[in-house]
Amino acid sequence: MKKVLRYLVMTVLAICFTIPLNAAEAATVALLPLVNNVAGDELANQVYYKQAINAIKAQPGFVLVENDQLTQAFENAKINTAGIDQKSLEKIAKDGDVDVVFAMQLDKLARKPLNRTGERVLKLELEGKAFAYNRLNGVYYVHNLKGGKEIDEALTSRWDWAHEEFGRAVRQEISRALRAK
């Protein structure tokens, strides 16, 4: 009986130690700089990085990486001058040795007042694109950003509504891109 009990305990211990050691490795994510085509809006870059880093950290199974090899791959791709396309993202993923590459382009970010009777209303004008390439499954993700939300102007007097909505769009696009199959 002691031998059976000893083998049973050894089996349980072996299972308890081997299961956690077989955990899958996290996929590496490269976050490329924002291609900002909005003149004079430097705050969008800060919002982009802050929201993107937090969104990637919140996704289980993904880890954000930044190294010299990835920086060199980005500089060789010349994304800021040539534009973002599938081939350039594939090249960055291959040369930078990362699993997922995410990039975003912002073309328009403005608050436009609408003249209506009664309260003044602001309309958000948000245009851009989100790009991602997943080297693990070969999926290329492109999504157009459009913002047409409206809000009373009185509510926006103490906070930056346009950049908050842009940050929300960044979080949504990263979540969608990392789930793309």
Where would I find each of the regions flagged by the language model?
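N-terminal segment of the mature soluble domain
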Residues: 26-28, 39-103, 137-142, 172-177
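Extracellular loop and loop/strand-boundary signature of outer-membrane beta-barrel proteins
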Residues: 115-116
